[in-house]
Amino acid sequence: LICKSTDVVLTQVSGDKNAIGYISFGSLNDTVKALKVEGVEPSTATIESGDYKIVRPFNIAVKDGLSDAAQDFENYILSSDGQDIIEKAGYIKIDKSAAAYASNNASGKIVVSGSSSVTPVMEKLAEAYQKANVQQSDSSTGIKDAINGTSDIGMASRDISDDELSQGIKSVTIAQDAIAVIVNKDNAVEDITMDEIKAIYTGSKTTWSDESK
């Protein structure tokens, strides 16, 4: 199955003993089991050390000439206040020496849209900031929304392509995330290799009989 929502992936995997999926590390909960990858368990420590290998950036896409209100929210996200919220939500802050938030006192509506992986932490940021409306979709939609002006800020849980950047937006990394490979809690598998992940997702392996225990 192709699922565009983190919640759907969690529901599918928690309800099927043979299912496998991948989600944002920050969205991991006790309804599923995260596998070790190459013997390394996903954790804040192993992500920061580089021992856990499946990592990705959380980016936002914004246009030049951002409204004062939207710029203030971006400033909040990148401040020590915003970065602390990101860390408390289970993600890796990108600036441990960020300055404290200083408001520009702007007012106005701020629309943020995009990645379902980024949405949970963006909602926490918006709740603390109290002025942003977060709309969940997917990375590509969020970037398109930023390009065409439907949103002030697009959320992406991937690198923003050169083609997308050429359409008048810039990429700002707000956090680092790991991708947790998840299985049903009743699955006996505890560890998986990168080659095994590739084989499963390319369809060359379709059973658990020869996977790591």
Regions found by a protein language model. Give the residues of each.
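Exported/periplasmic ABC-transporter solute-binding proteins
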Residues: 1-213
